[in-house]
């Protein structure tokens, strides 16, 4: 029996299994280890990941992302005139990760472990567990994301304290974690469920529009997504470059 570990992220997700004493990352159909946490409806069928993220630009009316931010709430997303809650959309992402794992491993996946932010409340955790019910699989457990990070870093039996700084695409989480032997204890947590890399993308997009005489808030969804994508790529390039240029051909039409 193979248990799949799932890092269900706000903007990206990935899966891993433990084989022969070490973790093995699962590639998706594109050979990539990271799958965008995006969902879209194409010809009446659910598509997840890279294609869905692209369709946020071309078909925003039937695509969604960042839904993890609304786990444990009554917020729904209208995709192709049908309403989906955050847990249902998240289940589509997990289903895709399971299918990728089964294709890669040639094994059946019946159980998953899903990581969640340490600050998730009871309703948010229950919503995450509901993913298993929607897919007909067992959620063996939920593991706090800082605990998972500490386990990866804690290599011996000595007492250690870590500060886990998790600045993701959609959230910021900071935790103080104590480790001793096989015991992981989270002593303090703080964070912001609505601050992440996508918010930097949004700020850059608004500034780009301001500098070019545009009002970001009145642009249609496709325009906004095009600008967001260009600014996201610029942000990534700024990790290795001091200056980058953002240009959009679509603004000429």
Language-model segments: which ranges?
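Oxyanion-binding/catalytic loops of NTP- or PPi-dependent enzymes
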Residues: 1-73, 77-83, 92, 99-252
